Each structure stands twice: as structure tokens, then as C-alpha cells.
Swiss-Prot record:
Gene Ontology CC entries for this record: cytoplasm; nucleus
Primary location group: nucleus
Gene from which the chain derives: sh3bgrl2
Domain of life assignment: Eukaryota
Molecular function terms, GO-annotated: SH3 domain binding
Compartment(s) of residence: Nucleus
UniProt KW Nucleus keyword: yes
Name of the molecule in the record: SH3 domain-binding glutamic acid-rich-like protein 2
Locus of motif SH3-binding: 61-67
Alphabetic keyword roster: Nucleus, SH3-binding
SUPFAM superfamilies recorded: Thioredoxin-like (SSF52833)
InterPro entries reported in the protein's UniProt record: Glut_rich_SH3-bd (IPR006993), SH3BGR (IPR051033), Thioredoxin-like_sf (IPR036249)
Homology family: Belongs to the SH3BGR family.
Entry annotated with the keyword Nucleus: yes
Amino acid sequence: MVIRVYIASSSGSVAVKKRQQAIVGFLEANRISFEEVDITMLEDQRLWMYQKIPDEKRPEKGNPLPPQIFNGEDYCGDYEDFFQSKETNTVFSFLRLPSVKDSES
């Protein structure tokens, strides 16, 4: 399974850009393999992302904003979920990856 971070390269929102950069930077710094999927360039990927996000994670109005994180077809969460997992030191579990300890055994 591959981690996919759905981003919007042409977002006009500074907050969205900072959140995207925070996730990508963390994954790169921790050498976690991932793909960026730009939903502004790939209509089919944007629609796929929207369909796969659980109802309870959708906003009352409009569409979910990037960044959104998936492991293969499994939805992991959005920026808030990612941030919470960083704060509680559960990022590997959040991403549905074996922990560093598991891979060292």
C-alpha cells in the first residue's frame, strides 16, 4: 500500500498550503514513502477522493478541502487528524503503517 496525500497545487488559501507543506515535510523528514496527488490537475482523482471520504468527515457545505491522506484505498484522515496523531505520537498507526519498532524486529 502506498500513502497518498491529496493536495491542491493552485489553492488560493494560505492555510491549505501550510497544511499541505506540514504533512509533506513531516513525511519527507521521516522518510515515509508517499505520493502527492494534485486534485487541481487530475479530475478523476479529485472525484475519487471525494467519494472515498466518509460522510462524517465531510463538511456541511461544499467539498472536503485538501490535504486528505489515504493508504491505498483506505482513508486515513485530514490535516486535523494528522496533527492529532503527531501530538500523540501515533502517526504510523494513523497512516496504517507498521511502527518503526515493528520494522526493526
